[in-house]
Amino acid sequence: MDMITKMVMERPVVIYSKSSCCMSHTIKTLLCDFGANPAVYELDEISRGREIEQALLRLGCSPAVPGVFIGGELVGGANEVMSLHLNGSLIPMLKRAGALWV
């Protein structure tokens, strides 16, 4: 989990994903379309991906992908991100984290 903590503090928005996951693709597209430029870690393509996936599950991100962190805090998965978007909270959250300069 220390590895995740270090990784999510390096960028305003971090997405843990799998290259074959359609929900991960949807969330990456949404955040990129806003201009957030997230750091994306494809767990099926990096050496410690399995270990990170297990740590995400222990943190409460279920399913583990997509796992979205904004401002160093776990937001959750696709359902949580889409709920924030629909209720108008996502863009202000991205601005507070320094991911958007609008």
Swiss-Prot record:
CDD domains (UniProt xref): GRX_GRXh_1_2_like
Q: Provide a Gene Ontology MF annotation, just one.
A: metal ion binding
Compartment annotation = Cytoplasm
GO cellular component terms given for this protein: cytoplasm
For this UniProt record, the keywords arranged alphabetically read as follows:
2Fe-2S, Cytoplasm, Iron, Iron-sulfur, Metal-binding, Redox-active center
Q: Where does [2Fe-2S] cluster bind?
A: 21
Keyword Oxidoreductase set for record: no
Kindly list the biological process annotations in GO that this record carries: negative regulation of transcription by RNA polymerase II
> Where does the record place the Glutaredoxin domain?
1-101
The answer to whether UniProt assigns keyword Cell membrane to this entry is no
SUPFAM superfamilies referenced in this protein's UniProt entry, alphabetically: Thioredoxin-like
What the entry lists under InterPro entries is as follows: GlrX-like_pln_2, Glutaredoxin, Glutaredoxin_subgr, Thioredoxin-like_sf
What PROSITE patterns does the database record attribute to this sequence? GLUTAREDOXIN_2
Q: Name one Pfam family in it.
A: Glutaredoxin
Question: Of which family is this protein a member?
Answer: Belongs to the glutaredoxin family. CC-type subfamily.
Q: What does this protein do?
A: May only reduce GSH-thiol disulfides, but not protein disulfides.
The name this protein carries in UniProt is Monothiol glutaredoxin-S2
Which species does this protein come from? Answer: Arabidopsis thaliana
Q: Name the encoding gene, please.
A: GRXS2
